[in-house]
Amino acid sequence: MGYRLENKDINLNEKKFTRIAQGKTGNVFKCNGSAIKVFNNYAEDIIDLETAKYLTGIRTNRIILPNKLLFYNNGFKGYSMKLVKKDPKQKKIINCPTDELIRNVEIIEEDIKTLSDKKVLLNGINPENTTFNGKLYLTDPSKYRILDIGSTEELEKLNNYQFY
C-alpha cells in the first residue's frame, strides 16, 4: 500500500507530480491545480489528523486550508490544498498601491475572524508561508492548532498577533 488521497491511490513519482517547495515539515508537490503537502518522517510539531479533518470543513478566502487528507500505509501523512501560483513577473507587495494593500489585509482579517470563531490558532506564520501574486495569501496550515481557550476575541487577538 502507498499514498492515498481521498480514497484514491497516487504515485508521487509520476511526472504529473512536480515538487514546488521543500521546508522543515515536508515537501509540496503540484498536480492538477492542487498543492499536496507531504510531511517528512522527522517533522515535529505538525498538524494532527483530527485538526486537519476539522480544517477541511472551514471555508476561507485567502488563508489556505487542507481540502483532502493524504495517507501513507494507513497513517496520516499530509493533505492537499488550493494551489496559489507565484508569478515572478507579478508586482511585489511593497509596490502595491495602499488601497489595494489595505483590501488584501482586510480579506485576511476576515479569514482570521472566521478561524478564530472556529477556535483555530494560526501557528507558524512566517514570510515563507505567505504569497503575493496581486492577492495576499497565507499558504501553510501545517502548524495550525485547535484551541478551546477563553473567548473568541482572545483567540482573534492571538491570531492577529501571528499575522502582524
Segments and roles (model prediction):
Residues P97-T98, D117, F132-Y164:
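C-lobe/activation-segment region of protein kinase-like
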Residues K91-F132, L136:
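Conserved kinase catalytic-core helix
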Residues K30, V38, L83, T131-F132:
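Conserved hydrophobic "DFG−1" position in protein kinase catalytic cores
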Residues A43, P88, I146-D148:
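Conserved protein kinase catalytic core
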Residues M1-D45, I58-N61:
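ATP-binding glycine-rich phosphate-binding loop
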